[in-house]
Amino acid sequence: MTSWVGRSAVEIAAAVRERRATPREVVAEHLDRIARLDGRVGAFRRVRAEAALAEADELAARGDLAELPLAGVPLAVKDNLDVRGESKRNGSAATPDTPAAADHVAVARLRAAGAVVIGLTNVPELCVFGTTDGVHGITRNPWDLTRTAGGSSGGSAAAVAAGMAPIALGNDGMGSLRIPAANCGLLTLKPGYGVLPAGIGGGDWFGMSENGPLATTVADARLMCALLAGSERRWPSRVPPTGMRKVAVSLRSPLLGVTVAAPFRAAVREAAGVLIKAGHQVRRADPPYPASLATTSLTHWTAAVAVDAEGLDPRLLDRRTRTQAAIGRRFLKGVRASTARDTLRRRLEPFFAEHDVLLTPALARRSPAAEPWHERSWLRNAAVNSACSPLSPPWNLTGWPAVSVPFGVLPSGAPCAVQLAGLPGSEQELLDVAAEFERLRPWRRTAPLD
């Protein structure tokens, strides 16, 4: 019997459309894998076993099955997005346990394309931190179960890396897609502002947070983005690759005082070598990050959480979340009036006038141990976030696209990754470069948990 675990969404959908597999067969096999492995990984907060099988049967009876781009593909959804009939807990005991009346638009579009939602994935409380743990347990990296999967889309990333779902939906407010993708060996895109529908929390974290895909292949990520864009046609049209691109390579952390560990610098150097051999014009060049970037990141990050915590019982929040919200309330008025993000864009635009793509490390060091970080102080959590993922915030603050691409392996055996960033509208170009890495340096797609 053919196994569909570890196959891409494109492969699965083609098999279902061609009647080589049924939606029930595909969904049931992934549910079985969840039942066997998720006790070790902790990817899911809620598994929709009966509902998913029923929806798979309904899908099989549709007359347009042969036309659906994601026919029968199991989909994991981050637990801060509405799924009809399911409660959205956002990693917290303080949020209402009330079933959603309708799907979030991003979920609805993927379902309309034939995807079957198999479960809601774990997040840190209010999707704040770079480790996924809290009232719903600890989410571990399937490649190294002693380490966190990262956050805040940690459950979604762990589900895909463990082969429990071929694709997942997550979002990124300060690296929340790219951090867990880099830890778990996945491909992800944080799109630019307004490219894909957001609608995440209170004001999308001042427009910094975007929905996006977690996938094992560039083709799956590209397909998800095209479907998420829907009829709004904001997804950039794909143009044929133009051949040589001007690629800037930077090993520098944007945050002063934070250094990038040697294995992550080495991965970028090796990735640059791959691009040189592929015919691109590659040179070392550091973006002119301002010294104030750390302050801008901190004020916007904490203020966004203050907005999301409004109306929630503080007694039910984790200590680190309460502290973050309290700090953010002090900055809220200033952030709403701030022009710091416009200043950052103006500062970086001349750099990208000279370069098509920026290549950097995706992370500065390996992910922290899989431990109850939610029981520790806010300061300790913030310090770990800054130390591990200083290269994510600039692209949320600017609202520009960034991609995390698996590249190489760390000394521990866990995946390593690089980051690609560009100007607004460069999403397809960044994915084209990611596809070159995929072709020239293919990565392992599923963690060997069996």
Label the predicted regions.
Residues 190-266, 270, 289, 441-450:
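A short helix-breaking turn/cap at a secondary-structure junction
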Residues 70-90, 244-250, 299-349, 361-365, ...:
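Short helix-loop capping/hinge segments that flank enzyme active sites or metal/cofactor-binding pockets
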Residues 23-28, 57, 262-286, 309-314, ...:
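Acyltransferase
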Residues 19, 30, 72, 112, ...:
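Glycine-rich, small-residue loops and helix-cap segments
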Residues 102-225, 397, 401-409, 414-417:
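Short glycine/serine-rich loop segments
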Residues 52-54, 62-135:
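Acidic/His- and Gly-rich active-site-bordering loop/insert found
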Residues 1-54, 273-280, 349, 446-450:
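An N-terminal boundary/leader segment
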Residues 59-74, 220, 240-248:
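Immediate post-signal peptide segment of exported/extracytoplasmic ligand-binding proteins
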